[in-house]
Amino acid sequence: MKAGSLKRWALAPALAIATAAALALALVASPVAGQANTTYTVTVENLTTGQPLTPPVVVTHSSDIDVFEPGQAASSQLQALAENGNNDPLLTLVGSSSAVYDSATGTAPILPGETATISVEAPAGSLISTAMMLICTNDGFSGLDSVALPASGSKTVEVNAYDAGTETNTEDFADIVPPCQAVIGVTSDDEGTGETNPALAENGVVSAHAGIQGGTDLTTADHGWTDPVAKITLTADASGLPSSGGPPLDDGSGITWALYVAVGGALLLGAGSVVLVASRRTVR
């Protein structure tokens, strides 16, 4: 074999390595490469006897975003939900984030003892958060805080009540959204409000709710609760699971696929080395 031919054969292993590395890096850079979204059914059951819940906001996302975080100040979007039952600002916020895969909301309040079902999609390894107002409170809410979605089957989580820390708990109908009186059946001359009152600003953080204290319009007998306030079941739709025909998917990092490519590159490298050695022996 001529020297030029030997040089070309010597380049084969290097080309195999470069090709494998490029493919591996491309897959690692794309977290959901080769993955299909799974459809999840989210079922929310109201476990209270006197607290209707607003239609839940449901969000599937990565670890790069928090819908809420205990111990931290609530966002203005969460404040709108917790004080006024207004989901729109939060839906707009998550809808503009690249860390969010899908979001949805219910269509009607969930009365005590009732359930609601919402569907969302997410790739493997995703998290889910939910938020819904406890209607007969100043700024109470409940929900899931960045819970890992099941790869298959179902997962059930019971959730407690949170205080958004944005409004003083006056427990006065004048400061509470109007549906409270109509739904529970305890009424007064105060119509209630769906607007934030700056005079009641608390400037606190998200924390465990102390519950209804009574003594004004809200009563422990009619509006009180004991935790948990809701049960949330997350069910992966078997018909929407990623195909099992190829190599197993990882948790969303892309590393498993990259390993397959790297192994393929190593095999190409080995083949190139064998050909090179054989060629050298032929020349001799």
Q: What residue ranges belong to the model's regions?
A:
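C-terminal low-complexity, Ser/Thr- and acidic/Pro-rich disordered "stalk" regions positioned immediately N-terminal
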Residues: 237-254
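Extracellular low-complexity, O-glycosylation-prone Ser/Thr/Pro/Gly-rich "stalks"
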Residues: 56-58, 68-70, 82, 89, ...
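Bacterial N-terminal signal peptides that target proteins for export
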Residues: 2-18
